[in-house]
Amino acid sequence: SSTLKFELPYSINTLFKLLQDAAKVFASAGFDIEIVEKHHNQKLDAPSGTALALADSMKEVLEDDYFYRYDRSQLRQKRDPKEIGISAVRGGTIVGEHEVIFAGEDEVIEFKHTAHSKAVFAKGAVEAAKFLAGKPAGMYDMRDVIAAKN
């Protein structure tokens, strides 16, 4: 079953697919998965919806026993190999930064997206509106918008 993703930037939607492909390879090779997200100091939710959507996209292709770990501050135990760690940073005027880390033995692979302005969200919204014009009522997401452009 697929989770609907309403993230508007094309880049984030492309990242969903890249992470699914990477998660299949690296999780089975024993890599740990971590997400670190950063936003401005006025943001109320933590972790962000985008961080959760990134985690959800990977969890869709992983074994059912993977779970999210939001806080390790009270734990005194080794990291569970089936956890996806999600950490949130809030400070300054950071528009949005999401980093997904696959940490293995003697190597680390990182995927990172940084939004320098909210314009990337507006561009995606405009493309989505153009796509929806004249479409019958139904459930769509940005994957439909991207597929229509290819």
Question: What is each residue range found by the language model?
Answer:
Residues 1-4:
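Conserved small/polar residues in nucleotide/adenosyl-binding loops
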Residues 7-9, 13:
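Active-site capping/gating segments
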Residues 14, 18-30, 46:
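Rossmann-like NAD(P)H-binding beta-loop-alpha module
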Residues 30-150:
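C-terminal substrate-binding/catalytic lobe of Rossmann-fold NAD(P)-dependent oxidoreductases
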